[in-house]
A protein has these predicted regions:
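Short peripheral tails and domain-boundary helices/loops at the edges of structured domains
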Residues: 69-89, 95-97, 102
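Conserved hydrophobic positions within beta-strands
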Residues: 9-11, 64, 72
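Residue-level recognition of beta-strand microenvironments
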Residues: 12-14, 58, 75
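Short, charged beta-turn/beta-strand-edge "cap" motif at the junction between a beta-strand
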Residues: 51-53, 58-60, 78-79, 103
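Acidic, low-complexity mobile loops and tails
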Residues: 1-48, 88-120
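Short, Lys/Arg- and Gly-enriched loop/turn segments at beta-strand edges
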Residues: 56-65, 82-85, 107
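Beta-solenoid/beta-rich acyl/carboxylate-transfer cores
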Residues: 45, 63, 69-71
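Generic structural signal for buried aliphatic residues
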Residues: 46, 52-53, 73
Length: 120
């Protein structure tokens, strides 16, 4: 299992051929306490830059975008009914989507730094 980070505030956890995307500590800090969440993309094929989720937090209203292409295999629909799950530090609770068919080189371009400063 490997975890990498995207500059827009997402983490990506790779476990075999499954890639779990969730809200990182940076994303939580940027948005503040999440009060509303809209999962824009819940099925099908995801392209890099597609909006996957819109959130309203104490500090900002933000759209989060996909860091790479992939096939959605699961969406955490619980975060729409309980958006405070995104405030959790637990990756079992704060995940957004799970993908397959991700190119390894796209994943490897993400940062190893928890608080990346710029997009690679």
């Amino acid at each position: 299992m490997t975890i990498k980070y995207h500059v827009n505030g997402l983490y990506v956890k790779k476990d075999g051929d499954l890639y779990q995307i969730g809200l990182s500590g940076k994303g939580q800090d940027d948005v503040g306490d999440v009060m509303f969440c809209d999962l824009v993309k819940q099925e099908g094929y995801l392209s890099k830059g597609d909006t996957i989720m819109g959130v309203e937090g104490a500090k900002a209203v933000t759209d989060f975008t996909a860091p790479f292409d992939g096939q959605i295999v699961a969406a955490n629909q619980a975060i729409e009914d309980q958006p405070d799950l995104l405030n959790s530090s637990s990756q079992e609770e704060n995940w957004i989507l799970k993908l397959q068919e991700v190119k390894e080189e796209d994943f490897n371009r993400l940062s190893d730094q928890v608080w990346p400063e710029e997009d690679d």
